[in-house]
Amino acid sequence: MAKKQILLNAFNMNCVGHINHGLWTHPRDRSTDYRLLPYWTNLARTLERGLFDGLFLADIVGVYDVYQHNVDVTLRESIQLPVNDPTLLVPAMAAVTENLGFGVTVNLTYEQPYLLARRFSTLDHLTQGRIGWNIVTGYLDSAARAMGLNEQLPHDERYERADEYLEILYKLWEGSWEQGAVLRDKVGRVYADPAQVHQVKHAGRYYHVEGYHLAEPSPQRTPVLFQAGSSGRGQRFAARHAECVFISPPNRAVGRETVRTLREQLVQAGRRPDDVKVFVGA
């Protein structure tokens, strides 16, 4: 029997400390340099030398403001605030590496699918096929308020919207441009064949999109899809869409049961039990 191959992802966030709250005060800690590009390019080079498979970048939209009904502690301790956009780091890190992959968290609840499709196609081009998307739907009421809502959408409704969102993205990434659409014919003055570029028309419960995908086909077209939801609805979503799932169980027994349930959900979704790679937080 062939040996299983372990895959290693580093886990970070475009902020001070990430989940190691308070460690930024240690004399040897350099995470306050997160604002500077060399901090990230040096990290990328180090991970590549260490034969890591990828760098997983977390993100949040919103702030932690529940404790004492304010953000005072969040700001004093720098608990994922301030936090910068993770997607903008990727091209710089890709430029100094050859094999390192990048999984970037983007909350789809507050992004229009048409624009997000272009952003990830652009990242896929610039990384030459090394980009992944960690799909999240959000969990902070502060984010909902910042985006013009009174509170978060109900949990399961967020995943219903996410299913439709992915349906649109697949149409844009996989269906708008045929494989032979890009000719780059300088003599004939034809960059792309109009007959092979198609308008996407989607009219659903939550989204209406009518347009051509703005980016030409990228190396992967659809990025590697990560998901980290542990609820029943989140696992059903992962079973339908994900290629990689991130879990952080409190012990082995819980982790084993989480993976077993996920494998069952994959079969129910018409996929093979081993179609998804599971990454465990450590």
Located regions from the model:
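N-terminal beta1-alpha1-beta2 module of alpha/beta enzyme domains
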Residues: M1-V96, Q220-P223
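Internal, glycine-rich beta/alpha segment that forms the wall or movable "lid"
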Residues: K4, Q112-H241, A269, D274
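Hydrophobic faces of well-ordered beta-strands that scaffold small-molecule active sites
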Residues: I6-A10, L55-L57, L100-V106, G129-I135, ...
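Active-site-proximal loop/turn and secondary-structure-junction residues that shape catalytic pockets
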Residues: N14, V61, V106-Y110, T137-D141, ...
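Short, solvent-exposed loop/turn and secondary-structure capping segments
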Residues: I19-L23, V66-H69, V136, A144-A146, ...
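The substrate-binding groove and active-site-proximal loops of carbohydrate-active enzymes
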Residues: T25-L37, T74-L81, G101-P113, Q152-R158, ...
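Generic structural signal for well-ordered alpha-helices
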Residues: W40, A44, T87-P91, A117-S121, ...
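Glycine-rich, aromatic-lined ligand/substrate-binding cores of catalytic
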Residues: R236-G281
